[in-house]
Amino acid sequence: ENIERSSLLVVQIEDSEGVEIIKSILDVKGIDAVFVGPYDLSISLGIANKFDSEKFKAALDKIIEACKENRMPLGIFESNENRITKLKTSGFTFFCLSSDISFLINDAKRILINLKE
């Protein structure tokens, strides 16, 4: 009981099969949120990194609709401010802005630049 109160169960949708069965996934008791992995999803759809394609948008629309119907928080990995604004308007409620490795690389670059000065 304590684990349920202090845990968050987020399912990740990263392939076309996940999109197709999103409603069934959301029927599972205990899911707290859905997170879309856009890079893997676009590859699975055969349109690697083509996030403005109709096929990718249709997949997102299906996920968005299912999450809205189930009042399920929906997140995605996105660092572009313009796309974040559009995604927020369409129904996404949380965003992963970067990855741990990106933060580490950028910080290391900053330190090296400062050391050279």
Predicted segments — roles?
Residues E1-E117:
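Expand to "…catalyze enediolate/carbanion chemistry for C-C bond making/breaking, isomerization
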